[in-house]
Regions:
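Short, charged, surface-exposed hinge/linker loops at domain edges
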Residues: 1-11, 40-118
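Short aromatic-glycine-(Arg/Gly/Cys) micro-motifs in beta-strand/loop hairpins
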Residues: 9-30
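A short, exposed loop/beta-hairpin motif centered on an aromatic-Gly-Thr core
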Residues: 26-41
Length: 118
């Protein structure tokens, strides 16, 4: 089975009561839902969301709108410069990020199937 890699920006959010200690954003998936008390918790949560989205890749038209190349047997994400990753994360969260961590999240491509109502 093939693998899919995307970059995730993880940072300490100044509003920890709302977002958790760490928040994240992935411009390739437009996902800003993964947050938590540790970086490992954030990455684990994001991996689960990414696998779910990849399962639904043939039914989730936004992937193609966001520059992904998807088929029954493959998925290739768009590639972004690190500076863009950080600036988009700052724009989405409306904060200036100190000490951002860019983490490559690599998952096995799951079988394509509809698991959510998209």
């Amino acid at each position: 089975m093939s693998r899919v890699s995307v970059k995730l920006v993880v940072f300490k959010h100044p509003d920890a009561a709302r977002w958790g200690t760490y928040a994240s954003y992935c411009p390739a998936t437009h996902n800003f839902c993964a947050s938590g008390k540790t970086i490992a918790e954030v990455v684990s949560s994001f991996e689960e969301m990414l696998v779910r989205d990849l399962e639904n890749r043939m039914f989730f038209v936004n992937f193609k709108n966001w520059g992904w190349k998807v088929s029954e047997n493959s998925a290739k994400s768009p590639n972004f410069a690190d500076e863009y990753l950080i600036s988009e994360t700052e724009r989405i969260f409306e904060v200036t990020i100190k000490d951002p961590q860019i983490i490559t999240v690599d998952v096995e491509l799951p079988k394509s199937r509809k698991t959510i109502g998209v």
